[in-house]
Amino acid sequence: MKLSLLSTFAAVIIGALALPQGPGGGGSVTCPGGQSTSNSQCCVWFDVLDDLQTNFYQGSKCESPVRKILRIVFHDAIGFSPALTAAGQFGGGGADGSIIAHSNIELAFPANGGLTDTIEALRAVGINHGVSFGDLIQFATAVGMSNCPGSPRLEFLTGRSNSSQPSPPSLIPGPGNIVTAILDRMGDAGFSPDEVVDLLAAHSLASQEGLNSAIFRSPLDSTPQVFDTQFYIETLLKGTTQPGPSLGFAEELSPFPGEFRMRSDALLARDSRTACRWQSMTSSNEVMGQRYRAAMAKMSVLGFDRNALTDCSDVIPSAVSNNAAPVIPGGLTVDDIEVSCPSEPFPEIATASGPLPSLAPAP
């Protein structure tokens, strides 16, 4: 993932943690395909689901297309700035699908490099099924994550208009930004420092493609096909290794061969404003999933009134559970952790047996 870094908030939390049934379970409407759902407006999404899983995700795999959609969902939604609006300028439409509708403009933004093929594939799906691009991006994200063990089941609301304007430039925080710049940009969009850390759980499934081409698709943690806390643990390990022949853009030393470390991740893990939240994400896959789901529910309605949208979460499949406990990778110990939260002791996390890992590129 060449990243950029993706009603009341209480209502968002409640909605985000109430797991829906599904896919197609427990509803009162029977769709033409025989599926059961809560609302007739949701029926079209079963057809989109089959199309995405068969073609876009190449048989429901947790591979590169999932990582691309995680970039896209964040880059689309974060094009939202109340500060610009207050200054009398267009502040962006948020999660409106403008990255697809206005790809001729938005794909020229440096943060969106390498997304053209994925955007065009999504455009074809949206047109074929007659769904809005904003809805499609949110749906494809939830479906894609369901292919990755351990992922939370994301909320999916439909009803976004397909009318949008191009996002203003320079609204996507990037891996070379300092922490203050990231927190200021995310704060403008309505996210607290804690929520910034929560959203970075997406990096559990991430790899980089454009930051260091010599180590193409090098993962950001040792389990890039599993949604787990290893990303938070491993980003706190001392950087000792240069995984490629030279360091790439916004790259820091890594704890073992094959793993890529983004400068923004390393800084956020150690900054006084975010370090304690970061540390709290290391020891519980369940807590990480709950927090990510809540933050994604909030991001998915940037620019929209959630009460005007229809809940079709029951169409989203559930991911396979991940029962593996968090570990400090083999060859390392807790002494290799750069503890950065002064107010709380580092959690007790087991150390894996075996030698220091050496990671292959993510698929």
Curated annotation (Swiss-Prot):
Enzyme Commission number: 1.11.1.7
Active site: 75 (proton acceptor)
Compartments reported by the entry: Secreted
Enzyme class at the top of the EC tree: oxidoreductase
Disulfide bridge partners, by residue number: 31-43, 42-312, 62-148, 276-341
Reactions catalysed according to its record: 2 a phenolic donor + H2O2 = 2 a phenolic radical donor + 2 H2O
DNA damage recorded as keyword: no
Cofactor note: Binds 2 calcium ions per subunit.
Residue sites binding Ca(2+) 1 per the record: 76, 94, 96, 98
Keywords assigned: Calcium, Disulfide bond, Glycoprotein, Heme, Hydrogen peroxide, Iron, Metal-binding, Oxidoreductase, Peroxidase, Pyrrolidone carboxylic acid, Secreted, Signal
Modified residues (Pyrrolidone carboxylic acid): 21
Signal peptide residue numbers: 1-20
Domain of life, source organism: Eukaryota
Molecular function GO labels: heme binding; lactoperoxidase activity; metal ion binding
Pfam families per UniProt: peroxidase (PF00141), Peroxidase_ext (PF11895)
Binding residues annotated for heme b, in chain numbering: 203
Positions annotated as glycosylated: 162, 358
Cofactor: Ca(2+); heme b
Coiled-coil positions: none
BP-aspect Gene Ontology terms: cellular response to oxidative stress; hydrogen peroxide catabolic process; response to reactive oxygen species
GO CC, any one term: extracellular region
Binding site for Ca(2+) 2: 204, 221, 223, 226, 228
Alphabetical list of InterPro entries matching this protein: Ccp1-like, Haem_peroxidase, Haem_peroxidase_sf, Ligninase, Ligninase_C, Peroxidases_AS, Peroxidases_heam-ligand_BS
PANTHER family noted in UniProt: CATALASE-PEROXIDASE, THYLAKOID LUMENAL 29 KDA PROTEIN, CHLOROPLASTIC-RELATED
Family: Belongs to the peroxidase family. Ligninase subfamily.
Protein name: Peroxidase
Organism: Coprinopsis cinerea (strain Okayama-7 / 130 / ATCC MYA-4618 / FGSC 9003)
Annotated gene: CIP1
